[in-house]
Amino acid sequence: MRKIPLNCEACGNRNYNVPKQEGTATRLTLKKYCPKCNAHTIHKESK
């Protein structure tokens, strides 16, 4: 398992690091709280 950073879709801020198994082809998307936007937004896996 690797730690993958998640970027906020709205502002691009890196807010979270989540574990992800290696070998999965799809990119992770989660709805999380962004303190900079002060709202729940979609966070996508960054490279």
UniProtKB/Swiss-Prot annotation:
Keyword Transferase on entry: no
Keyword vocabulary terms for this entry: Ribonucleoprotein, Ribosomal protein
Gene3D superfamilies: Ribosomal protein L33
Any one GO molecular function term: structural constituent of ribosome
InterPro entries: Ribosomal_bL33, Ribosomal_bL33_CS, Ribosomal_bL33_sf, Ribosomal_zn-bd
A single GO BP: translation
GO terms under cellular component: cytoplasm; ribonucleoprotein complex; ribosome
Keyword Zinc-finger: no
Pfam family, one: Ribosomal_L33
Family, as annotated: Belongs to the bacterial ribosomal protein bL33 family.
Stated name of the protein: Large ribosomal subunit protein bL33C
Native source species: Staphylococcus aureus (strain MRSA252)
Taxonomic lineage from the root: Bacteria, Bacillati, Bacillota, Bacilli, Bacillales
Name of the gene this protein is made from: rpmG3
